[in-house]
Amino acid sequence: MERVHTLPDAGEVVFVDASGGMDRHGQRVFLLMCWSPAGGLPLGVIVSTSETEAVVDKAFRLLVGILPDGAFGGRGRRGPLCFMTDDCQAERNALSAVWPEARLLLCTFHVLQAVWRWLHNGKHGIDKQHRQAIMALAKQLVYANNEAEIATTMELVATEWGERYPLLDQYLQGFAARRQEWALCLRTDVPTRGHNTNNIVESAFRVLKDSVLYRTRAFNLLQLFDSVTVQLSKHYARRACDVTNGRQRAALRRSAAAPAKKRAL
């Protein structure tokens, strides 16, 4: 993983997410990934007992302490240009505290999923026949070409639905206030390389669970630590060699299918 930090891509956009269900004690695993011509590559792994802001903040600071001076493509302790995450406030607050110069972006998929869930929450009183039309307007906000289109769409929402659904108007006002985090037209100055979702880190968790842990739970923390450091690094090293030697099909098979027999640790 240390060698991945030498790539220029490591200093651009870093994808961060957490998952669980990998050991019998319920530890949480955080992955920091970057894009590369060979696909997603890991920059760091954190294993913690919880996802509270204090714990995550401490974990990120410990990670900074072991990173090389030229980490994140030579940017060092300043961190990458931006992080892309889902809307986990504790995680985002911790990232902002540890790497204050980095910009925080929201995954487009999770943004729209959150709006969809809000519309389907019965407490908000949105009629079923209106949810799809309102969702289409939310998508217009996210995929707008400029801020003028965002303002026009917000006026349209207020005109058509504001009086009927005051909670919706209030929700979308708060949503629009965070446009710097989710609007695609406002991240053109960031080298996202077309990645506006957290798919890279989501697929990395599939690799970890399928090809490294073989859909089983680690027996204890030591075994989990070995899996997310030594075994995971070996997997990506083999895949990088496959891509370098022109064996892309082998690299894809390696990521998509787990071996039938588990290797002894």
Regions inferred by a protein language model and the residue ranges of each:
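An acidic- and aromatic-residue-enriched active-site/binding cleft used to recognize and process polar
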Residues: 19, 35-37, 47-51, 87-89, ...
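A broad, low-specificity signal for short, low-complexity segments enriched in glycine/proline
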Residues: 4-7, 44, 167-169, 202
